[in-house]
Curated annotation (Swiss-Prot):
It catalyses: a quinone + NADH + 5 H(+)(in) = a quinol + NAD(+) + 4 H(+)(out). Keywords: Cell inner membrane, Cell membrane, Membrane, NAD, Quinone, Translocase, Transport, Ubiquinone. It is an enzyme of class 7 (translocase). The lineage of its organism: Bacteria, Pseudomonadati, Thermodesulfobacteriota, Desulfuromonadia, Geobacterales. It comes from Geobacter metallireducens (strain ATCC 53774 / DSM 7210 / GS-15). It is found in: Cell inner membrane. It is a peripheral membrane protein. NDH-1 is composed of 14 different subunits. Subunits NuoB, C, D, E, F, and G constitute the peripheral sector of the complex. Its main location: membrane. This is NADH-quinone oxidoreductase subunit D. It comes from the Bacteria. GO terms for cellular component: plasma membrane.
């Protein structure tokens, strides 16, 4: 009986298909994957520990740098958790704007995913088109927050400021033009023979296994599990919006691709509904002990200046307790577990990053496949190392 020689291959930490500094130790029998061991931590910055030494407001910029392709989702989950501890109500206008920006962020993130996923498999045209469309959302980000990626736009109690004049017009231009671009992507990929050969039947994980591994987001729905936090555990007024939750049937890479394409169309649908319901009003809660005063008060009254200085320098106390808040980030469930001891800083903050959990299932998805197909499996998970390593 011939002996089998197992060959070990290092994929990364500097490899274009890992989309960051991820190292995979792959054991092969010929070209067939037998085992995958992920090595992570190259981008570790200690965000959870850093938050224990910063006030609740000062932690917001740290969240931007988790999934840096979806910063406003990172902000949203964090501020919702703190608001739940404080027991404050966010104004309706602020909630609606949060939903609009969260769904625009979903579009922006999924555009990067389809661009890089297609490029990994050899479809360069889609990469160029998707980044062209993404630039429209990036420009809007810059107009509204002053930054293209690390926006830090959401605040505990609402938003840092109201949207600019012309915001609604810019958003409507995006939602009116994007569906046609989605048709283009599908025309280039969905029935493409090479694309089908690389994705259909590849990276299969059953619904039961997906649940056991704790997978969430499009990767879970691609396995046929009908679960979406926006619908099943709504926040920020998502219960007011009508949208479909797409699910797959064959639990493979192609199904996860189809789920994300439908999600982009549904994001456009949600944004349209939110724009139609956007009404004038305040964008910060009426909670002076937590929120910053209006700029005109800071510049023109000593009371406003002192108020601003106290919150900026000392923060605000949060009642003793603990809370968990999850949001439907483009990659899956992003969760914040915060423990407060009654002070102005988190006693402990634990982040549940979807990419970290989803990456744990990569061996289950890819074992028995060819090593060439591993690139497609990594792409279909849509991982970001910023939130994996934290």
């Amino acid at each position: 009986m011939a002996s089998t020689e197992i060959m070990t291959v290092n994929m990364g930490p500097q490899h274009p298909s890992t989309h960051g500094v991820l190292r995979l130790v792959v054991e092969l029998d010929g070209e067939i994957i037998q085992k995958i061991t992920p090595h992570i931590g190259y981008l570790h910055r200690g965000v959870e520990k850093l938050s224990e030494h910063r006030t609740y407001h000062q932690t917001i910029p740290l969240t931007d740098r988790l999934d840096y392709l979806a910063p406003m989702h990172n902000n949203l989950g964090y501020v919702l958790a703190v608001e739940k501890l404080l027991g404050i109500e966010v104004p309706e206008r602020a909630q609606t704007i949060r939903v609009i920006l969260a769904e625009l962020t979903r579009l922006k993130s999924h555009l990067v995913w389809v661009a890089c996923h297609a490029l990994d498999i050899g479809a360069m045209t889609v990469f160029i088109y998707a980044f062209r469309e993404r630039e429209m959302v990036m420009s809007l980000y810059e107009k509204i927050s002053g930054a293209r990626m690390t926006s830090s736009y959401f605040r505990v109690g609402g938003l840092s400021s109201d949207v600019y004049d012309g915001f609604e017009k810019d958003v409507r231009e995006i939602v009116d033009t994007f569906p046609g671009h989605f048709d283009t992507y599908e025309g280039l990929l969905t029935k493409n023979t090479i694309w089908l050969n690389r994705t259909v039947g590849n990276g299969v994980i059953s619904a039961e296994d997906a649940i056991d591994y704790g997978i969430t987001g499009p990767a879970l729905r691609g396995s046929g599990v009908d679960w979406d936090l926006r619908r099943d555990n709504p926040y920020s007024g998502y219960e007011k919006y009508q949208f479909k939750v797409p699910v797959g049937e064959k639990c493979d890479t192609f199904d996860r691709y189809k789920v994300r394409l439908v999600e982009m169309r549904e994001a456009v649908n949600i944004i349209r509904q939110a724009l139609d319901s956007l009404k004038p009003g305040p964008v910060l809660a009426d909670a002076p002990q937590v929120t910053y005063p209006p700029k005109e008060n800071v510049y023109n009254t000593i009371e406003g200046l002192i108020h601003h200085f106290k919150i900026a320098s000392e923060g605000f106390p949060v009642p003793e307790g603990e809370v968990y808040q999850g949001v439907e980030n483009p990659k899956g469930e992003l969760g914040y577990y915060i423990v407060s001891d009654g002070g102005n800083k988190p006693y402990r903050m634990r982040i549940r990053p979807p990419s970290f959990v989803n990456l744990g299932a990569i061996e289950k998805m890819a074992k028995g496949s060819m090593i060439a197909d591993l690139v497609a499996v990594i792409g279909t998970l849509d991982i970001v190392l910023g939130e994996i390593d934290r």
